[in-house]
Amino acid sequence: MYIIFDFDGTLADTFALGSQLINEYADQLGYKQIDFAANKDKSARELIKMSGVRFWQIPGLIRFFRKKSVERAAEVNAFDGIPDLVCRLHDRGFHLGIITTTSAQTISIFLQKYGLTDLFTYIKPEISLFGKKRAIRRARRHLKSEIIYIGDELRDIEACRATDVPIISVSWGFNSTEILEKNNPGLVAASAEEVYNTIIRK
């Protein structure tokens, strides 16, 4: 079985850095600043609408912020218990993967920082913002394995529901516990230990 993680907001605490970068360049790139902390109940699509960004602008903006994020990737830390969770799952015989919009370089810097590089055998970086459904479907075909996905956003839940992949949501990322629980009842973990125990029970 593969345990596949989202990166931003699930493995890596990028919320503050990401929010800062997005708002820092708002005037230059022509969109409205967003108070991300006050809008954790909003989906990515709702936040895009609030910012005034047009959907055709999204690919270019993502490329821009991937580059900026790589420049500061060394600042990114793992959430509490995540390195230990990854090691414990690997030791139990689970295969590990990552599917994310984040750049391969940022992921590599992060995994090297925590000595986790060799534990992940499937990494699909730089997918489009709303391309997770397709990426998960392709992973199932390629890996020929059962998958459990670990993510922090509503769009993770939507992608997994569309591909019939079970998901464990985590409460420490982009979306609030309340909105995750509403959309993925009984499967929202508040700690890395809860993620581990939920996987083992499955």
Annotated model-derived regions:
Residues 2-84:
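N-terminal helical cap/lid subdomain that shapes the substrate entry/recognition surface
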Residues 71-98, 104, 108:
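Short, acidic loop-to-helix structural element flanking the phosphoryl-transfer center
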Residues 149-189:
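Acidic, Mg2+-coordinating phosphoryl-transfer loop and its flanking beta/alpha structural elements
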Residues 124-125, 187-191:
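Short acidic-hydrophobic, aromatic-tinged amphipathic segments that line or gate anion-handling sites
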Residues 1-5, 193, 200-201:
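Non-catalytic pre-domain segments flanking phosphatase-related domains
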Residues 32, 54, 117-121, 186:
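Conserved H-loop
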